[in-house]
């Protein structure tokens, strides 16, 4: 039979527009999984995109109740994983003094971020170092910038984590441009 496709089109929610414009406050919440060793637990479907968003939506409701707009999940062994609907990307100083964009390794129990992958492709072309690295909460606080990257919100700058204000990143506008370019080039 012929393939069937469905398409729905809706305006962006105000939450998305505000996150793009103003950034977000986020809470660090434990995900209940180790960063490594998930191969021993294949029944958990870690990193699989499914229609079961119960944990993610509950985490976002919990964050909203605490005055935060988003969540960054941390593994049970203390590593940064992902957001409920985003990939975590940080900016830090690289080995040669250039800005380096980092994100958690794709072999962690996370969903690979297509927006993050496109961002890294564009950023490398513009001279940024980009890499996958094990990150801990302290790395977020020490970073030159923290973003939650996704195909809908694009790049939401994280300005507060667990009530602690982060330094405004010098490259906030540049990051927004990189993500916009990545989205347009990843067609």
Model-assigned labels for residue ranges:
Residues 1-187:
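Helix-start/capping segments and mature chain N-termini
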């Amino acid at each position: 039979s012929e393939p069937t496709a469905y398409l729905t089109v809706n305006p962006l929610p105000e939450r998305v527009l505000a996150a793009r414009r103003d950034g977000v406050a986020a809470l660090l919440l434990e995900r209940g999984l180790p960063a490594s060793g998930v191969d021993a637990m294949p029944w958990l479907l870690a990193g699989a995109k499914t229609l079961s968003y119960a944990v993610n939506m509950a985490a976002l409701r919990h964050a909203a109740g605490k005055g935060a707009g988003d969540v960054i999940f941390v593994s049970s062994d203390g590593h940064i994983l992902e957001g409920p609907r985003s990939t975590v990307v940080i900016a830090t100083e690289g080995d040669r003094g250039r800005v380096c964009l980092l994100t958690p390794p794709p072999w962690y129990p996370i969903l690979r971020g297509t927006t993050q992958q496109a961002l890294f492709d564009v950023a490398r072309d513009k001279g940024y170092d980009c890499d996958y690295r094990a990150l801990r909460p302290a790395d977020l606080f020490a970073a030159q910038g923290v973003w939650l990257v996704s195909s809908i919100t694009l790049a939401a700058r994280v300005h507060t984590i667990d009530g602690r204000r982060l330094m405004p990143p010098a490259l906030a506008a540049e990051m927004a441009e990189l993500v916009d370019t990545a989205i347009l080039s990843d067609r």
